[in-house]
Amino acid sequence: MEKKKGVRGKIILECTGCVRNSHNRVSKGVSRYITQKNRHNTPNRLELKKFCPRCYKHIIHGEIKK
């Protein structure tokens, strides 16, 4: 039997600093985190302040489309 797909879905958070400063960064790549959110309680895009190992500081990570 299959599991029911609930309101909780997986989302990807991407570093906003790495995306904006892609032309002059020291390391290549973009920092991403995978997490879950309840789509009924939080219908808007999620933004969390998390540590970016590429920027070496805490910076806002925003939700991206899959």
Swiss-Prot record:
InterPro entries found in the cross-reference section: Ribosomal_bL33, Ribosomal_bL33_CS, Ribosomal_bL33_sf, Ribosomal_zn-bd
Keyword Ribonucleoprotein: yes
PROSITE patterns: RIBOSOMAL_L33 (PS00582)
Subcellular location: Plastid
Keywords assigned: Plastid, Ribonucleoprotein, Ribosomal protein
GO MF term list: structural constituent of ribosome
GO CC annotation: plastid; ribonucleoprotein complex; ribosome
One Pfam family in the UniProt entry: Ribosomal_L33
Any GO BP annotation: translation
Main localization category: plastid
Family stated for the protein in its record: Belongs to the bacterial ribosomal protein bL33 family.
PANTHER family found in the cross-reference section: 50S RIBOSOMAL PROTEIN L33, CHLOROPLASTIC, LARGE RIBOSOMAL SUBUNIT PROTEIN BL33C
Record's protein name: Large ribosomal subunit protein bL33c
Gene field: rpl33
